[in-house]
Amino acid sequence: RSLVGSEMCIRDRYIISSGGAPRKAGMTREDLLKGNCEIAEQLGKDIKTYCPDVKHVVIIFNPADLTGLVTLLYSGLKPSQVTTLAALDSTRLQSALAKKFGVMQNQITGCATYGGHGEQMAVFGSAVKVAGKPLSEIIGTAEFPVEEWKQMQQDVTKGGAKIIELRGRSSFQSPSYLSVEMIRSAMGGEAFRWPAGTFVNNEKYKCIMMAMKTTLDATGCHFEVPTGTADEVASLDASYEHLCKMRDELVTLNIVPPVSEWSKINPNL
């Protein structure tokens, strides 16, 4: 017989979910907050009910930082077991720089966007190298003026919206490839080292899902807070504050309880 809804993931150990409503032209990822987070709530509950042996879950549907957070909360899983797709923006930065400097994409290293997977993301360039040369030594020269770098950063943050404007729908090839690579790593393949959205709760960033400097492997997702220039860190802090506002809106919408009560739903948080 055909399987529908939650039956499709009974006893699954590895899950990729793109089950929310897609963005449409003129929409931001944040516009999807209420409806898709309600879907994420049910997804988390279904994972807890039907998938007792699940090892790892990758959430794709936007706003991914919040849908991933809600899924984690209601699934009862450990923070290391739920990640969100965040690498698209880093690969877009890599592609843009490769095109700018006329080199192969694999000659651009260290590209990363951190914080939220939205237009408030923090685009880091301080660790980037172009064919082995630090990007920081090129920015501000005649070859790559500061204004051009700032425009590229802005273009990266709006890359998803540009695709929708041109195609009339969201991208699916790159998200599919990267999410499968994430699951492959969780299953024991080569570690996934592009930034992933992960649950963060430390002295500076409290109870939020956001892209960090991560390593995803068979033991789960592990992160460290990225280092960068003062401007980059300030951009990351601003992205975190934006995510907190959306998280708090979920409390107002009664999709999640106050953060102080999360451990009652998921003791791992």
Language-model segment annotations:
Residues 13-16:
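N-terminal Rossmann-like NAD(P) cofactor-binding module of classical short-chain dehydrogenase/reductase
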Residues 28-96:
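Rossmann-like NAD(P)(H) cofactor-binding subdomain of soluble oxidoreductases
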Residues 75-81, 90-269:
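C-terminal substrate-binding/catalytic lobe of Rossmann-fold NAD(P)-dependent dehydrogenases
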Residues 10, 45-49, 184:
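Surface-exposed alpha-helical segments enriched in charged/polar residues
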Residues 19-21:
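Conserved NAD(P)H cofactor-binding loop of Rossmann-fold oxidoreductase domains
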Residues 1-5, 10:
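Single conserved hydrophobic/aromatic residue that forms the stacking wall/gate
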